[in-house]
Every structure is written in structure tokens, then in C-alpha cells.
Regions:
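Bacterial N-terminal signal peptides that target proteins for export
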Residues: 1-10
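Bacterial N-terminal signal peptides
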Residues: 9-17
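Sec/Tat signal peptide C-region and signal peptidase I cleavage site
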Residues: 19-23
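N-terminal catalytic or cofactor-binding beta/alpha core of small enzyme domains
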Residues: 24-191, 209-218, 253
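Active-site-adjacent mobile loop/cap segments within catalytic or ligand-binding domains
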Residues: 192-253
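A short, hydrophobic C-terminal helix/tail in secreted or cell-surface proteins
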Residues: 257-274
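Short, charged juxtamembrane terminal tails flanking transmembrane helices
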Residues: 276-278
Length: 278
């Protein structure tokens, strides 16, 4: 369902125009959504023309040196608040989400990840401080109704992994924007819940832990999850997501070498010219 160039192509081009020290990680940031408006708010960052006919805006976004790629399901013929499973990338299904996760991350090699899902029936921007390697889950829509429990066999059952997003910076900037959102960090024991929000959120933290070494060619600096309130309209959600992305990029910039504009434009050109349907 996704459109993306093989990251090996990107890295090869990258190495032609920047120093070897800066060639060991991608300049790609991955964002994911589920139920509306978390899919619609990131639509312009999809490189799939079927989902984003107006064109991908993620290449060297705002001249900040990073390509932003969004992946999310669609819900044709459905109306909320119960949107169902959906179709496409990251359907609201445990097995589909996990399979898509490992496939897409192997192609994107994200240097940072933000996963999003629908939250409470309010105007909240809820930054999750952690996600849990749960041993019990709320059933999804189709058999098998639950995932492997726990999903991560390398980590303590029911153990927590911590977000590596710049959580307080995100909250402060969203509040300062005057969007009418209640932005806060959720530090509760419940973490991201017992459904797909927690599941994909945990996958993000799990992936980042695997690729946390700066010597890893798929080095991932930061990952975390945000719940978006049901009452948040798509325009407001989009603005808050972009604010969150800017804060994430500042965190990544403080950690990784700067490739320079020439390197990023080379990457973006190859992405645009060599996308393939998967």
C-alpha cells in the first residue's frame, strides 16, 4: 500500500554529497495515524498519491533537513465514532499493524518516529510518557483478535519502555500556540491503554531501542506516541502535529550531524523519482 524508495538508494546517494560521518543514518522521520483525525491531519505527508493526490510536502520539510513520511489507514464508507478496522497501511488490527511496522521501518530507516492515535472525547494533545509490553489486550475486529502477549519477547512482560520524544517541549509549544488544546504528558500507569494505541506506541519505542546505537546505520534517535482528542478538528490537529514535528526535529538536530541542504535535496529527488508501490 505504501509508496517509498528503498533506503539503500538514499544512503548511497547521501554518501556522495556528505561526509562519511553523516552517512550512517537516514534523514527520514516517520509518522503514523489510525482513526480520524489522526490519519487526515498527516495526509499531506503521505508519499502515496492515492492517499495524497495534492502531492507530498515532506521532502526537506520547511527546509529543516528532514523528509517526513506518513502512513495511515483509510475508512471508506465508515462514520465515527466507531470507525472499525479500515484498510491499507496500519489497519486497526494487531497482526496487520505489526507486519506493516517491520516492513515499513525497514524501508524508511527512520531517524525519529511519532505515532498518533485517537484519544479521549475532548480537546486534548496527550503525549504518552511510556508504553507497555502488555500481556493482555482488548480484542480487535478479526481473528486472531489479540497479538502475541507480550509482543516483545526480549523485554520484561508488562514492563514499560519510556518515550524519547522531547515531551515537555512539545507540550509547551502546543500550549503557547493558542490552539485551544489541553496539552499534557500522561505519566499514568495505564500508559497508552490496552488497544492499538498502546500496541503501535510500544512498537515505536521497541524499534528505537533496537536502533539506539549511533553506530547503527538505521540509528533512531527518538520515538513516542501522542493521543489526539476526538473533538480536535483536522485543521487544529494538523497545526499541533506540525508544532510537535518541529520540536522533534530540534531534538534530532541536537543529536545528529547536519547533512547540509545539498545532501537532503539529493535524497529528496531520488525519493520523488524512484518511489515504488509496495
Amino acid at each position: 500500500m505504501s509508496n517509498f524508495a528503498r533506503p539503500g538508494t538514499l544512503v548511497a546517494a547521501f554518501a556522495l554529497v556528505v561526509s562519511p560521518a553523516a552517512a550512517d543514518f537516514s534523514r527520514n522521520i516517520m509518522i503514523t495515524g489510525y482513526w480520524p483525525q489522526t490519519n487526515n491531519m498527516m495526509r499531506r505527508f503521505s508519499a502515496n498519491p492515492a492517499q495524497n493526490p495534492d502531492g507530498w510536502i515532506g521532502q526537506n520539510w520547511e527546509g529543516r533537513g528532514y523528509n517526513i513520511y506518513a502512513f495511515f489507514p483509510e475508512f471508506p464508507g465508515q462514520n465515527g465514532p466507531n470507525w472499525g478496522r479500515g484498510e491499507g497501511d496500519f489497519e486497526v488490527d494487531y497482526q496487520d499493524t505489526s507486519a506493516d511496522w517491520w516492513r515499513i521501518t525497514s524501508e524508511v530507516d527512520p531517524v525519529a518516529i511519532m505515532t498518533y492515535s485517537r484519544g479521549n472525547n475532548d480537546m486534548s494533545w496527550e503525549v504518552e510518557s511510556r508504553n507497555r509490553n502488555r500481556t493482555n489486550w482488548t480484542p480487535d475486529y478479526d481473528a486472531p483478535f489479540t497479538p502475541d502477549s507480550p509482543p516483545d519477547p526480549t523485554f520484561t512482560p508488562n514492563g514499560y519502555r519510556d518515550s524519547s520524544l522531547p515531551m515537555q517541549d512539545i507540550v509547551d509549544s502546543v500550549r503557547a500556540a493558542g490552539l485551544g488544546l489541553n496539552a499534557y504528558i500522561d505519566r499514568s500507569a495505564a500508559a497508552g491503554g490496552t488497544f492499538l494505541s498502546e500496541y503501535i506506541g510500544y512498537h515505536g519505542l521497541w524499534y528505537q531501542s533496537i536502533h539506539s546505537d549511533p553506530n547503527d546505520e538505521a540509528w533512531c534517535v527518538a520515538a513516542g506516541h501522542v493521543h489526539v482528542g476526538i473533538r480536535v478538528d483536522v485543521e487544529t490537529a494538523t497545526r499541533a502535529m506540525e508544532i510537535s514535528l518541529r520540536e522533534l526535529i530540534e531534538r534530532v538536530d541536537a543529536t545528529v550531524p547536519n547533512p547540509g541542504t545539498a545532501g537532503l535535496l539529493m535524497i529528496g529527488g531520488l525519493v520523488a523519482g524512484r518511489r515504488r508501490r509496495l
